[in-house]
Regions:
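Charge-enriched amphipathic alpha-helical scaffolds
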Residues: 2-6, 71-97, 204-207
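Positively charged, polyanion-binding regions of nucleic-acid-associated proteins
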Residues: 39-56
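Short acidic, hydrophobic short linear motifs in intrinsically disordered regions
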Residues: 57-66
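Conserved small/polar residues in nucleotide/adenosyl-binding loops
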Residues: 280-285
């Protein structure tokens, strides 16, 4: 904002907002504007969630998601007005027909292949807390398995908070987009993150298996492999493998690894749709 005159920065790192700016802001900061900003902000959170767990979804599904939060049970017409206004300000998604599509999957009509993989599965509808969490972090920071991984990265590998957050997002991105453990280990290697002992590797493997099985995936329209397996067991009908491929890496104990046939990864390595992870420059450059 400083280059537009909204903030004045001084050489001693002190900054202040000019009185003229404060005066104008007080004039335009009406209850109506605040309400509009609330609705646009919540819509952006819902779009972020849609991109993270579906990539493409019917507008009616996103509408259901939007209305779950108290105070946002708007009509479908108002929902579309908010969505279209956000599209003018922030082009994260586009409306095509009766569907909302994350822009990252428009290239080469990738969204069509994603829909083909998803098949006729139902859409998982996230809770309000999940939507807010994913929109803020780009991954499920409150999930038990991800918290275990966070503790491991912090306590065992002695990583700082910013680096831990970066890696947790990368882990979610890879697993949710059909990636494998080898993809994640490659990202670790790029950042010169190494394991000090076999004991660390032995602890790491089951944590990653648990994280994988509790990750909401595009192929499953937001459901986790564990949830898909539970439904399959209830129906007693065989389904496609509900867990991603784990490739033994070095001294990883293979008895702790889910051993599935690998699938070709079809999803792009695009930045997190919530935008909060763009500070991770190496990831945003993918």
């Amino acid at each position: 904002f400083s280059n537009k005159g909204y903030i004045v920065a001084y050489s001693d790192n002190y900054a202040e907002v000019p009185q003229e700016v404060i005066s104008v802001y007080k004039q335009v900061n009406t209850p109506e504007l605040q309400e509009k900003c609330r609705k646009l902000s919540w819509m952006r959170s819902c779009e972020s969630m849609m991109g993270l767990i579906y990539a493409i979804a019917p507008l009616k599904i996103v509408y259901r998601m939007y209305r779950k939060r108290d105070g946002f049970r708007v009509s479908y017409e108002e929902f579309m007005d908010i969505l279209n206004e956000l599209a003018e300000k922030d082009g994260m998604c586009i409306v095509k027909g009766d569907k909302l599509i994350w822009k990252a999957v428009l290239q080469d009509n990738l969204y069509e292949r994603i829909e083909e993989f998803q098949g006729e599965r139902d859409f998982y509808i996230p809770t309000v807390d999940e939507i807010l969490d994913y929109a803020k972090h780009g991954y499920p920071s409150q999930d038990v398995s991800y918290r275990k991984l966070s503790s491991f990265l912090r306590d065992e590998l002695h990583l700082e908070e910013e680096k831990t957050e970066e890696l947790l997002y990368i882990v979610y991105k890879e697993f949710s987009m059909d990636g494998m453990l080898s993809d994640i280990m490659e990202e670790f290697n790029k950042r010169d993150i190494v394991f000090d002992s076999d004991r660390q590797m032995e602890r790491f493997a089951p944590i990653m298996m648990e994280v994988n099985n509790n990750t909401r995936m595009l192929d499953f329209r937001g459901y986790t492999p564990n949830e898909i397996n539970r439904v399959s067991e209830q129906k007693t009908t065989p389904v496609a493998p509900a867990m991603q491929s784990f490739v033994p890496m070095g001294n990883l104990p293979t008895n702790n690894i889910v051993n599935m046939q690998p699938k070709k990864k079809i999803y792009p390595n695009d930045p997190c749709p919530c935008g909060s992870c763009l500070l991770y420059t190496s990831d945003a450059a993918d």
